[in-house]
From Swiss-Prot:
Residues 3-130 form the Nudix hydrolase domain. Keywords: Hydrolase, Magnesium, Metal-binding. This is Uncharacterized Nudix hydrolase YvcI. GO terms for molecular function: hydrolase activity; metal ion binding. Its EC number is 3.6.-.-. Belongs to the Nudix hydrolase family. Pfam families: NUDIX. Disruption phenotype: Cells lacking this gene have an unchanged spontaneous mutation frequency, even in triple mutT/yjhB/yvcI disruptions.
Length: 158
């Protein structure tokens, strides 16, 4: 049986800019965030992780995506992750240019799809910036992070 890892992240968008983090290992751009601590709520986790990685305190983050990531080697499930993605449009503080996790940079919303990132992340970021409601998704990758399959289920909240 594999252990389910829980992570949170946040897409901070102000005007037409989004703050992203470039991970050093593959050079991929991601929404800042990280692993939840034992007993921590998803909201507390995203606020803490965002501050740790960026120096910024996000104000009133809203949950907009719940995702399952399955890493498979053949028919064997190597690991499973649950990711809770939030959006925010206001914050206090100023971002650092670099943290232990990588380099931080504001990007124009229209340039996001041209950045190097995990194959499924473009779909997630696009919905976070432009979609309405809550997005559920499942992504299956190889251990080398080749995307095997994905499914997205937007849920429009009335």
């Amino acid at each position: 049986m594999t252990y389910l890892q829980r992570v949170t992240n946040c897409v901070l968008q102000t005007d037409d800019k989004v703050l992203l983090l470039q991970k050093p290992r593959r050079g991929w751009w991601v929404a800042p965030g990280g692993k939840m601590e034992s007993g921590e709520s998803v909201r507390d986790s995203v606020i803490r992780e965002y501050r740790e990685e960026t120096g910024i305190y996000i104000i009133n983050p809203q949950l907009k995506g719940v995702f399952t990531f399955i890493i498979k080697d053949g028919d064997h499930i190597v690991s499973e992750w649950m990711m809770f993605t939030f959006v925010a449009d206001s914050y206090t503080g100023q971002n650092v240019s670099e943290s232990e996790e990588g380099k931080l940079q504001w990007h124009d919303v229209n340039d996001i799809q041209n950045l190097p990132m995990a194959p499924g992340d473009g779909h997630i970021l696009d919905f976070m910036m432009k979609g309405q409601g809550l997005l559920h998704g499942t992504f299956t990758y190889t251990p080398e992070f080749e995307l095997l399959s994905y499914r997205l289920d937007p849920q429009h909240i009335k």
